[in-house]
Curated annotation (Swiss-Prot):
This is UPF0301 protein Reut_A0705. Belongs to the UPF0301 (AlgH) family. It comes from Cupriavidus pinatubonensis (strain JMP 134 / LMG 1197). One of its GO terms (cellular component) is cytosol. SUPFAM superfamilies: VC0467-like.
Amino acid sequence: MAKSEAPINLTNQFLIAMPGMADPTFSGSVVYLCEHNERGALGLVINRPIDIDMATLFDKIDLKLEIQPVAHQPVYFGGPVQTERGFVLHDPVGIYVSSLAVPGGLEMTTSKDVLEAVANGSGPHRFLLTLGYSGWGAGQLEDELSRNGWLTVQADPEIIFSVPPEERFSAAIRLLGIDITMLSGEAGHA
């Protein structure tokens, strides 16, 4: 009788795309996993700013941005699912209509009230706004991991909020203590 493997839980971890990632959507990406369970996984790409800043987005959704320091912060590509919808990753500050508390410290909010709070200065000071999210069905992420598609490491909020986006990939790799140039995109087989 085969021993069943305990399910893995990668919530509050970074997924780091392996060199040679065939999918251009995720090549060179770092994904913060907000949720991972037997039904699948949900995460946000944290290192892919798009050509829109907070001021422009707030204009489009008719919100008056009263706090100028955030006006020129970039909006990010969070993933290929629901790209017309905003997802805010932030420190657990405030109570919002639709928030997912990520075990380990951060929250992901999808309701407009968090943007209203950011706009008037009463919201979280550390946040990352994405359009879209990254999603995997049951067993899909585990399959990609078994095929050498991703590296995983415990997430560090400082990388999300304090490191420039173009340096987040290498900063996440450094958490593993490895040299990315020494990795092959091919899995070895005996």
